[in-house]
């Protein structure tokens, strides 16, 4: 399945939870989910009973849409998570949180992961001083993520950093908002990652 490029707020209404696909609109209370908290379509207000398989599939789809990854990428992350020692679901969350585009989002340089991915692919970032434009790059603890000098006055980046006063920052990153760089200090603990996803159901789905 290719990455979804349609109206993102319909996705949130479909699942009935905020996936922060429209960051500033959500903070302002203007998201489509808040205005119409039911699924899109003629019969959207009558949510159907979902089977066990349907619940598992929904959790996978939610995670994919929220992090902006394709089916191929997501399955590869699961295979890696299963190969590692420890809880497969926790490993999966840790691995996806290490994606460069997600780390940029967690550092507050972007209000959404979609914009964070654009910053990466358009070459606005340096990782340990070197230009890197691969959103799926796996960031390691101690690495420095920096906005390139020519992009430091980008109005969307400046605005995103201003909004971190409302949203806060992930405890596993440190940033210097004035110099526009951050350090991925450590891997997150599972309980620190607040996402509307039950990864246990994803593991059950892929393990069939």
From Swiss-Prot:
Q: Which family does it belong to?
A: Belongs to the universal ribosomal protein uS4 family.
Where is the chain membrane-spanning? none
Swiss-Prot/TrEMBL keywords: Ribonucleoprotein, Ribosomal protein, RNA-binding, rRNA-binding
Chain's gene name: rpsD
- Entry keyword Nucleotide-binding: no
Q: Which GO terms describe its biological process?
A: ribosomal small subunit biogenesis; translation
What is the species listed in this Swiss-Prot or TrEMBL entry?
A: Sulfurimonas denitrificans (strain ATCC 33889 / DSM 1251)
Q: Where is the S4 RNA-binding domain?
A: 98-160
List cellular component terms (GO).
Answer: small ribosomal subunit
**GO molecular function, a single term:** structural constituent of ribosome
What is the name of the protein in this document? Small ribosomal subunit protein uS4
Quaternary structure (record)? Part of the 30S ribosomal subunit. Contacts protein S5. The interaction surface between S4 and S5 is involved in control of translational fidelity.
Q: Does the keyword Nucleotide-binding apply?
A: no
Family annotation (InterPro entries): Ribosomal_uS4, Ribosomal_uS4_bac-type, Ribosomal_uS4_CS, Ribosomal_uS4_N, S4_RNA-bd, S4_RNA-bd_sf
- PANTHER family the UniProt entry points to: 30S 40S RIBOSOMAL PROTEIN, SMALL RIBOSOMAL SUBUNIT PROTEIN US4M
NCBIfam families tied to this protein: PRK05327.1, rpsD_bact
Entry's Pfam families?
A: Ribosomal_S4 (PF00163), S4 (PF01479)
């Amino acid at each position: 399945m290719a990455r979804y490029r349609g109206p993102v707020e319909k996705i949130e209404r479909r699942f009935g939870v905020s996936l922060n696909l429209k960051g500033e609109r959500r903070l302002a209370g203007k998201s489509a989910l808040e205005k119409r908290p039911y699924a899109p379509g003629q019969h959207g207000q009558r949510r159907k009973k979902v089977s066990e398989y349907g619940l598992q599939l929904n959790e996978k789809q939610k995670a994919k849409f929220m992090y902006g990854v394709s089916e191929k990428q997501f399955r590869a992350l699961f295979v890696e998570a299963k190969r590692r020692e420890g809880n497969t679901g926790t490993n999966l969350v840790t691995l996806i949180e290490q994606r460069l585009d997600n780390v940029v989002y967690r550092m507050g340089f972007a209000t959404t992961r979609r914009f964070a991915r654009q910053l990466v692919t358009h070459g606005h970032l340096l990782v340990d001083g070197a230009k890197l434009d691969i959103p799926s790059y796996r960031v390691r603890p101690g690495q420095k993520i920096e906005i390139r000098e020519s992009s430091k006055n980008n109005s969307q980046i400046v605005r995103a950093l201003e909004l971190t006063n409302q949203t806060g920052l992930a405890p596993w990153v440190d940033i210097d908002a004035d110099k526009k760089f951050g350090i991925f200090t450590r891997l997150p603990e599972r309980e620190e990652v607040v996402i509307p996803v039950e990864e246990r159901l994803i593991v059950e789905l892929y393990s069939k």
